[in-house]
Curated annotation (Swiss-Prot):
Top-level EC class as recorded in UniProt: isomerase
Glycosylation sites: R158
GO molecular function: intramolecular transferase activity; structural constituent of ribosome; UDP-arabinopyranose mutase activity
The name this protein goes by in its record: UDP-arabinopyranose mutase 2
Assembly description: Heteromers with RGP1, RGP4 and RGP5.
Expressed in which tissues: Predominantly expressed in shoot and root apical meristems. Expressed in epidermal cells of leaves, inflorescence stems and seed coat. Expressed in pollen.
Site feature: Required for activity: R158, R165
Cofactor: Mn(2+); Mg(2+)
Pfam families listed in its UniProt record: RGP
Gene this chain is encoded by: RGP2
PTM comment: Reversibly glycosylated in vitro by UDP-glucose, UDP-xylose and UDP-galactose, but not UDP-mannose.
Statement: the UniProt record of this protein carries the keyword Secreted: no
Keywords: Acetylation, Cell wall biogenesis/degradation, Cytoplasm, Glycoprotein, Golgi apparatus, Isomerase
A biological process term (GO) from this entry: plant-type cell wall biogenesis
């Protein structure tokens, strides 16, 4: 049995890393009491809360946190007609927070994620580990069998090319979860009582050319390097699919990171995932995606971006054209999704003008 950490009595971190360069984005439909547990690690940072569902509902945020809160009315007001690209009644709405942030780094976490304990019983400061991951290079071109060579106590093994040891910039840090695993509905149904109790003390770079199923509940990224590609798609209300928002974004960002020679890391940090979602509800959301993914994944595996695509925006627009051309025959939904991908980039550039942000 794995339990969350007890952080009562832990002091608020007096020297938080990147305090003025990082926003924490939280999508929610409920009060954010879970932030009490995270206070020692997260209180010094600015929060962007994206309220899903009924905009008239009052969301309670624990005292002492600095935050902005956006509901659907705010999204419609800020984006106008382009608000159609932001999902409703789905945690995919979190990507609006990425768009309105003005910071270099983003950490996003779900409201059912608590502080985990490492094997020694110490509370895990997930954000601090994400920051370490992002500030260290990645090694996507050659696999290091000691995993992350830049971690303390590790290095490049014998036979690792010296020409590749400088590594590349890390764009994404993908964390994991103890307790409730991030399973699809069919797996949930056959393993309803399974809990993840394995804490693997490792961080690794996902190799170039390899896709992965990105989970958005414990994720950090360099907004300047990959932000415009962190679009969580059209999910939830009025859409034929759900629970593929983070994975769609993950497939897109991995193709783009590979093209632009950027790194994606996975492994530490862990959070404690407290609440199992309903597998029958999940199956209804995932049903089409379970079949579609058998064609979507080969599509991304074979996606090749042109040499002319040198910015994230250019890469993403090229990818949207490929989605329209190659996946629309699968379902008309992908035609709509491809259009939404373009709308997302237009909205991003409106709120983040390249000249002002330095992201040409």
């Amino acid at each position: 049995m794995v339990e969350p950490a007890n952080t009562v009595g832990l002091p608020v971190n007096p020297t938080p890393l990147l305090k003025d360069e990082l926003d924490i984005v939280i999508p929610t439909i409920r009060n954010l009491d879970f932030l009490e547990m995270w206070r020692p690690f997260l209180q010094p940072y600015h929060l962007i809360i994206v309220q899903d569902g009924d905009p008239s509902k009052k969301i309670h945020v624990p005292e002492g946190y600095d935050y902005e809160l956006y509901n659907r009315n705010d999204i419609n007001r800020i984006l106008g007609p382009k608000a159609s690209c932001i999902s409703f009644k789905d945690s995919a709405c979190r990507c609006f927070g990425y768009m309105v942030s003005k910071k270099k780094y983003i950490f996003t976490i779900d409201d059912d994620c608590f502080v985990a304990k490492d094997p020694s019983g110490k509370a895990v400061n997930a954000l601090e580990q994400h920051i370490k991951n992002l500030l260290c290079p990645s090694s996507p071109f050659f696999f290091n069998t000691l995993y992350d060579p830049y971690r303390e106590g590790a290095d490049f093994v014998r036979g690792y090319p010296f020409s590749l040891r400088e590594g590349v910039s890390t764009a994404v840090s993908h964390g994991l979860w103890l307790n409730i695993p991030d399973y699809d509905a069919p797996t949930q149904l056959v393993k309803p009582k399974e809990r993840n109790t394995r804490y693997v003390d490792a961080v690794m770079t996902i190799p170039k050319g390899t896709l992965f199923p990105m989970c958005g509940m414990n994720l950090a990224f360099d907004r300047d390097l990959i932000g415009p590609a962190m679009y969580f798609g059209l999910m939830g209300d009025g859409q034929p699919i759900g629970r593929y928002d983070d994975m769609w974004a993950g497939w897109c960002i991995k193709v783009i990171c590979d093209h632009l020679s950027l790194g994606v890391k996975t492994g530490l940090p862990y959070i404690y995932h407290s609440k199992a979602s309903n597998p029958f509800v999940n199956l209804k959301k995932e049903y089409k995606g379970i079949f579609w993914q058998e064609e979507i994944i080969p599509f991304f595996q074979n996606a090749k971006l042109s040499k002319e695509a040198v910015t994230v925006q250019q890469c993403y627009i090229e990818l949207s054209k490929m989605v329209k051309e190659k996946l629309s025959s699968l379902d008309p939904y992908f035609d709509k999704l491809a259009d939404a991908m373009v709308t997302w980039i237009e909205a991003w550039d409106e709120l983040n003008p390249p000249a002002a942000s330095g992201k040409a």
